């Protein structure tokens, strides 16, 4: 889902892989994240689908990719599942956040009872605390969701009642009142490109996970010694 008139730039960036991609323009500019998801309704074709945000870089701690971890859980549980990551409260202004209960029979899976877009620390402490996590740590969105076709009428419902941009979390709130909705704590890490120093952090994470790790660490030590 892209902004109008930006399709050409994305095709150019995709290079030889552009013919594998389908671009859908979000005609209602500024209508919000929820409206962008709704624009993909026809493309989803009435099937469950994997949604990934475009400004996150994800690294798996296992040979299994992050998206595959999430899809396996959604396939087995046959319901909506959002990938989440333990996140300190200072970063709450950047992410949607869930609250709920850990499932004893399913490792890393949370039955979602509440979801709030970018909560305040006070709001998170009151409504989103999950047993087993230390104080000041919450489960925030990872940038990946497996959504069911039922998300579309939920989004239509909240958009029709709103006078401004609608985040995906409002659609998820409407959905969890009617159907099962889980969170899955991905065995990996996500980095947000869209925040201050986000690109730098992503580049460092990518470099430190590759063959030049020692070289990069040496350069970082040199920089620290210069800029003490």
Range-by-range predicted roles:
Residues 59-145, 149, 153:
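Conserved core of the sugar-phosphate nucleotidyltransferase
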Residues 51-54, 83-86, 185-186:
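Short beta-strand segments
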Residues 23, 40, 55, 98, ...:
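Residue-level signal for inorganic ion chemistry
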Residues 108, 124-228:
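Conserved alpha/beta core of the MobA/IspD/sugar-nucleotide pyrophosphorylase nucleotidyltransferase superfamily
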């Amino acid at each position: 889902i892209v902004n109008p008139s930006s399709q050409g730039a994305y095709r150019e960036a995709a290079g030889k892989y552009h013919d594998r991609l389908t671009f859908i323009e979000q005609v209602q500019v500024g209508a919000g994240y929820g409206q962008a998801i709704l624009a993909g309704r026809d493309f989803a074709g009435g099937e469950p689908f994997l949604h990934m945000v475009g400004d996150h870089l994800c690294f798996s701690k296992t040979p299994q990719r992050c998206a595959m971890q999430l899809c396996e859980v959604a396939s087995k549980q046959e319901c909506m599942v959002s990938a989440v990551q333990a996140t300190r409260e200072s970063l709450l202004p950047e992410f949607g956040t869930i609250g709920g209960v850990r499932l004893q029979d399913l490792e890393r899976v949370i039955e979602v009872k509440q979801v709030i877009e970018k909560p305040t620390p006070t709001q998170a402490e009151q409504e989103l605390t999950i047993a087993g996590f230390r104080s000041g740590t919450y489960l925030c969105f990872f940038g990946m969701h497996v959504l069911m076709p039922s998300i579309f009428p939920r989004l239509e419902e909240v958009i029709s009642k709103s006078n401004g941009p609608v985040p995906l979390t409002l659609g998820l709130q409407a959905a969890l009142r009617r159907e099962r909705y889980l969170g899955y704590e991905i065995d990996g890490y996500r980095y947000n490109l869209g925040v201050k120093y986000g690109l730098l952090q992503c580049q460092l994470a990518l470099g430190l996970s590759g063959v030049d790790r020692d070289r990069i660490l040496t350069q970082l030590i040199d920089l620290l010694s210069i800029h003490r």
